[in-house]
Amino acid sequence: MGKEQNPRRVAENEAFAKTKMLRTSPQKLNLVAAMIRGKKVDKALADLTFSSKRIAGDVKKCLQSAIANAENNHNLDVDNLIVAEAWVGKNLVMKRGRPRARGRYGKIMKPFSEITIKVRQVEERA
């Protein structure tokens, strides 16, 4: 008579990972997310490894977490995984300031964002 198990939030052949508080704007993060959408996970990992974008390393960690979740928690085959979805959301915006001329104050916005990566197992095509 234990605790009831929560229902799955994704389909049987899917797994996901979410990373919050990434110190970049959602617009810049979405450029990296668009780079991996729809690709096989090994190709997406290679693209992130050699990307010149600063945030690509954090996206790579999130993708590796999604792959590990698929393998360990959902018993999916890693060789047949694709990046089904990768979406980006806004998080908080830290507000900072800089003194300006004539006693004024310039606002500096430091945005944070979050990314969710969903991987799906596809059937092997013969």
Curated annotation (Swiss-Prot):
Belongs to the universal ribosomal protein uL22 family. Part of the 50S ribosomal subunit. GO terms for biological process: translation. This is Large ribosomal subunit protein uL22. Keywords: Ribonucleoprotein, Ribosomal protein, RNA-binding, rRNA-binding. This protein binds specifically to 23S rRNA; its binding is stimulated by other ribosomal proteins, e.g. L4, L17, and L20. It is important during the early stages of 50S assembly. It makes multiple contacts with different domains of the 23S rRNA in the assembled 50S subunit and ribosome. It comes from Paracoccus denitrificans (strain Pd 1222). PANTHER family: CHLOROPLAST 50S RIBOSOMAL PROTEIN L22-RELATED, LARGE RIBOSOMAL SUBUNIT PROTEIN UL22M. The lineage of its organism: Bacteria, Pseudomonadati, Pseudomonadota, Alphaproteobacteria, Rhodobacterales. The gene is rplV. SUPFAM superfamilies: Ribosomal protein L22 (SSF54843). It comes from the Bacteria. One of its GO terms (cellular component) is cytosolic large ribosomal subunit. One of its GO terms (molecular function) is structural constituent of ribosome.
